[in-house]
Every structure is written in structure tokens, then in C-alpha cells.
């Protein structure tokens, strides 16, 4: 172990001496001197950090990922949203829940990007290379991308991604009378129903487009979530109710319906959206990623499911 930490210190000092630096204040309030143009980034979260870095044109040399039952590794939503994964890139897998410190050292990073929720101590990581912590709950995807673009000097690329997204939202608003349509996003979760103020990319699209939400959802603080008991399900009703199902572990849309049945048998009778056929199931891998590819998919999905559907006149 002493040998490993000696190597960490040696590598860290070498990297910091090699490049001009900029000062960056991370979400833990730490001021960190980071390379002005990092070339060897290690990411400690696939959805929140790795996929955005790929979209910004600076894929990490090593990343957190997931493990399939057969032992192979993958980036959650990686291929679906970017076409990139461990098996078709030079990216090294460094672990899932438990991060392999030696694998990080072997990647020779000049910058490590982690999150406050990661269980690998930041004090350990910063001995390897300059380390910053970005909180995905602090401002959501827009802030994640802004910070990553600042760290990597890719503000121009981010501006192009943002402009395309804004045009997609404008087109959705031209097509759909969003201000007069209510929406909700729900998810069965351990015997209760989970609702977020803004459900990741899907929720951001719905809010940016100007749809209205049930009061119970609007009362959730931005970035927050609540568990709702079965008897309060009618409070989550809307013109359209969206839900998601997880497919990267072999799940099917029917699994989410079964999970709702377990929360409340006959639940569909308590949602007018469900009775009308306006309960919409979407792929969770597409809906939860902090990526512009995900936002584009969600705009298309929302527009497709809502355009042309009959709704009763507002009372």
C-alpha cells in the first residue's frame, strides 16, 4: 500500500508540473488548480460525467461503468446515446460501486472528475491528479455541462448543442399548445410512487416546453423528489402521465406496469390519463441521462405522443 501511495504522489506531481493550469471552484467549495487543456480525464460516473464529456468531444481515458451478468462492462446508456462504450474505444473501466485505485493510476490522468456521492475519498484521488467534484443535483444538466465545458475548454461545442436543443424546444412549442396541457412523470418505487420536481432529461424537456404540472409536483423543491403513498395517486393525475422502464438490465415495459400493480391494484382506474390511454411508457436509459442526445430523443418522444391526441375542453 505504501508503494501505491508513493506512486500516486509521484504521478500527481509529474502531471501538475507538465501543463499550464486554471483555477476551478468545485461543488465542494474547493479551489483546485487543473490543467488548462486536460488530455487524460478519468470520470467517476458514467451517466453524469462520462456521457457529457463524450458529447463535448473530450472522452475520458478511463471511466466508472456497470457490469453485466456475463462479466462484461458497459457505460449505462453509452451506446444508445453516443455510440461509445468500453468495447469500441480506448476507455478503461475502473469499477462500479468500488473504484479500482490502481486502474486510475495506470490511466495516468491529468484530471479526475468525481461526484460528492462517490464513496472513493477525494483525499485519495487528489494524490493521483488534480480532482474536482461536480454535484449533479446542483443545477442539474445545464450546470454539469457548463462546468465540464469550462474544465475542458469546449464552450463552443456546448453552445452548438444548446442552440440545437433550444430550436427543438421552440418547434415543440409551435406544434403543441403546451401551456394548456398538464403532464406528470411517476415511477413505482418500493411500494410507493416516486415523483421528482424535474425528472432528468424528460422532466427538463417538459418544463422547458412550458407544460403544466400537478400542484404536488410543483411543490417539490427544484432538484428534489418525494415518495407518494398509493392513496394520493389521484393527486398525480394529469392530461398525460409519463413513466419509465429500465431496459439495460433486461427489463421490459411490463415490469413498470407490474410494479404499479404492486403499489396499488387497479391503479389505472384512479388516473384519467391512464383510462384515456395517455399513460406513456418511455425507456429509462433515454429519459434519465444528462445528455443532449437524450434531450433530443425526449423532445421527439413527447411531441409524437401528444400531437393529435384529443383532450377534453378545459373547465
Predicted feature locations:
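Sec-dependent signal peptide recognition
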Residues: 1-7
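N-terminal signal peptide c-region/cleavage motif recognized by signal peptidases
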Residues: 12-14
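Basic- and aromatic-lined ligand-binding clefts that recognize polyanionic substrates
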Residues: 40-44, 48-53, 160-216
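A short, structured surface patch at a secondary-structure boundary
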Residues: 47-101
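Charged, glycine-enriched surface loops/patches
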Residues: 64, 122-159, 166, 252-281
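Extracytoplasmic ligand-binding site segments that recognize negatively charged/polar headgroups
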Residues: 68-73, 135-147, 182-205, 248-255, ...
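Proline-aspartate-enriched helix->loop->beta-strand connector
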Residues: 101, 105-114, 130, 233, ...
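Structured C-terminal subdomain patch of bacterial secreted/periplasmic proteins
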Residues: 175, 239-315
Amino acid at each position: 500500500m505504501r508503494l501505491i501511495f508513493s506512486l500516486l504522489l509521484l504521478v500527481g506531481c509529474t502531471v501538475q508540473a507538465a501543463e499550464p493550469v486554471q483555477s476551478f471552484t468545485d461543488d465542494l467549495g474547493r479551489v483546485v488548480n487543473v490543467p488548462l487543456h486536460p488530455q487524460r480525464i478519468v470520470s467517476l460516473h458514467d451517466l453524469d460525467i462520462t456521457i457529457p464529456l463524450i458529447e463535448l468531444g473530450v472522452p475520458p481515458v478511463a471511466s466508472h461503468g456497470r457490469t453485466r451478468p456475463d462479466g462484461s462492462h458497459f457505460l449505462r446508456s453509452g451506446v444508445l446515446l453516443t455510440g461509445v462504450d468500453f468495447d469500441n474505444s480506448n476507455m478503461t473501466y475502473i469499477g462500479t460501486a468500488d473504484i479500482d485505485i490502481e486502474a486510475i493510476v495506470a490511466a495516468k490522468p491529468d484530471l479526475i472528475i468525481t461526484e460528492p456521492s462517490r464513496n472513493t475519498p477525494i483525499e485519495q484521488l487528489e494524490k493521483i491528479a488534480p480532482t474536482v467534484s461536480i454535484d449533479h443535483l446542483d443545477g442539474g444538466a445545464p450546470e454539469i455541462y457548463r462546468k465540464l465545458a469550462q474544465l475542458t475548454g469546449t464552450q463552443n461545442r456546448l453552445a452548438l448543442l444548446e442552440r440545437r436543443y433550444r430550436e427543438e424546444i421552440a418547434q415543440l412549442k409551435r406544434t403543441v399548445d403546451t401551456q394548456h396541457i398538464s403532464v406528470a412523470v411517476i415511477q413505482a418505487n418500493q411500494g410507493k410512487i416516486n415523483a421528482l420536481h424535474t425528472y432528468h432529461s424528460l422532466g427538463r424537456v417538459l418544463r422547458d416546453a412550458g407544460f403544466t404540472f400537478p400542484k404536488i409536483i410543483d411543490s417539490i423543491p427544484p432538484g428534489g423528489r418525494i415518495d407518494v403513498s398509493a392513496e394520493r395517486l389521484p393527486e398525480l393525475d394529469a392530461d398525460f402521465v409519463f413513466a419509465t422502464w429500465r431496459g439495460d438490465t433486461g427489463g421490459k415495459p411490463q415490469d413498470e406496469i407490474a410494479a404499479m400493480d404492486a403499489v396499488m391494484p387497479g391503479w389505472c382506474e384512479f388516473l384519467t390519463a391512464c383510462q384515456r390511454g395517455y399513460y406513456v411508457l418511455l425507456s429509462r436509459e433515454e429519459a434519465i441521462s444528462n445528455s443532449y442526445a437524450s434531450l433530443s430523443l425526449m423532445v421527439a418522444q413527447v411531441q409524437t405522443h401528444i400531437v393529435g391526441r384529443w383532450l377534453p375542453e378545459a373547465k
